[in-house]
Amino acid sequence: MRRTNRAWLRVVSGLAVLSLAGVAMTPSTAEACGGTFCDGGVPGPMPVDQSGENVIFVIGDTESEVHIQITIDPNTNAENFGWLVPLMAVPEFSVGSQPLFDQIRAASVPQYDITTTFEACGEPELDSGGFDPTAPATSSAGDSTDGATGTGDGPTVLLEEAVGAFQVAVLQDTEVGPIKKWLEDNGYLWDAKAEPILMEYLAEGNVIAALKLRRSTTINDVHPITLRYPASETCFPLRLTRIAAVDDMDIRVFVLAESRAAPTNFKHVLVNPLKIDWLNRATNYKQVITNAVDAFEANGRAFVTEFAGASSVVNTAAIYGPSWDENDFVGLDPVLAVQTLNNQGLGACYESFDCTWNHPLVYGMLLEFLPPPQGVDPADFYANLGTYAADIDVSKWDMGKGFAAGMLERVIEPGIHGEALIKTWPYLTRMYTTISPNEMMEDPIFHVNASLADVPALRTAQNYRLCNGDSVVTLPGGDEFYIPGGGPWPAIPGEEWWAEEVQTVTVKGAPMTIVNNTAAITKKRVEWNLDHNWPREPGAESSDSSESSGASGANGEGGCGCRSGEGSLGLGLGVFAMLGLRRRRGGVRAGGASVSRR
């Protein structure tokens, strides 16, 4: 059922700083399980770095969901991955869809573009043929046990099951000690800094979900996890993250609902667009957002809205394909396995060509159920299965039964569900912040407000090149800014405001402004323009109309600056967010730019 504006969900998630030592293994030094996040190949300008932590929330009347993206640093041992999630109730766990994350991110990534025109200067202008001379060369930017079990000195184990690549247990106790002992007995390496924070959650009535990768699982098998529950409140606490978080950690929250979402107990910030380097298509984006959310009254606990609009922008064809069918693999000759994947659109692996897989889990399942013989290159093996027919391990293939079951659980069912979410929930909101450990003192809550306006992902400025070599850039909101020499992007002396507005957003109606720097910013901008004789005195303009260069933002692939998580703790840190419901309001600026009303 669709939710109404009176339905409420509070989603809270947290990661304790624990690593896996392995039950029958010699304990090793805990390794950092960070991650790399990069949306490559997005058409058009994409200057915004997309590394960081990502969570999708789905808000419903009777059932709610949180989708958690888990990415492990490829330079670490995947077996040393451990994760704790405090929850208000025992959820239903399932395999999540990485393509759902990929497509939601690609459809909503904020983009900054600039179109250049030239003043007519009395001589024929050379057509730049779409090349902007001011632009940079590229834009940057299983088996389960259900029910309570336990011993007198241990926690109550409410649930144990295998979920895709993960082994999951849900623990309940009123004290940290029994949970700590259970974790250590089951191969988790305890971090003492987690104890007081975990106790806070136990005192609040939370149960603790513990996740670790199943034995023999590799990094190729890692996938998102979905938690689904019939509850009005559940939790994803940010407080646990501070144990091992880095300064200015990126957090990106996506909400699928009926209307636009906004932060409840965190502030909402409109970024000063003069701080964005439009000429270089916002290569300074993260620094601008970091400074804006650290501004007066935002205090390091605020979000900007990067996109808000119809969820139909998401390409569902890349989330699930109707040709995907696990039954095709049951009883299949293993020599035909790759050909069948090709036919279903899940692979493109042919002799004399590199093999590519159109779902991130296909390759890992092939390695598990149809491994190449020792010493044989996997790409050569999978492209030439007929040649290696006599060397295939038919016992592992087992008539394709395990592969088919894996296809259903890890690829097909998550894909069907992901596609259904986009088609069921008409609105997508994307919010972003950076936050440091000393700021992680409360868990962010979100709600839906039907009064809030759409926020486009693409922001375009106009660059008017003057005959004297200077430029006038018109920002998306219509404000003009004089650029001496046509660049670089100047900083106005004394114009120190990174946030144009700091707001609180209620359940209904327009946001309430706490800080409004618009007048001060405008005053400094106008004074700057006048100091540079802009606008011109009457009669000083060129008598000819301007000529368009046809230039626009670079259309190369985005230079997404991916990076691996760092640190000495064997725990992939996830986003911790709490979520509520409400509705939508009028136009705002998002991600540092004025946006049009719809």
Which functions belong to the PLM regions below?
Residues P91, V95-V163, P360-V362, L366-D377, ...:
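A cross-kingdom signal targeting lumenal/periplasmic-facing segments of multi-pass membrane
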Residues D49-A120, I179-G205, A209:
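Surface-exposed, glycine/proline- and aromatic-rich loop segments on solvent-exposed faces
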Residues T138-S140, S144-T151, E541-A577, R585-R597:
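Ser/Thr-rich, Pro/Gly/Ala-heavy low-complexity intrinsically disordered linkers and tails
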Residues T36-D49, W190-E541:
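Accessory, solvent-exposed terminal regions and/or long lumenal/extracellular loops of proteins
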Residues V12-A24, G574-M578:
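Bacterial N-terminal signal peptides
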Residues V23-A32:
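Sec/Tat signal peptide C-region and signal peptidase I cleavage site
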Residues G129-D221:
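Long alpha-helical, hydrophobic tracts
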Residues R2-A16, S564-L569, R584-V588:
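Bacterial N-terminal signal peptides that target proteins for export
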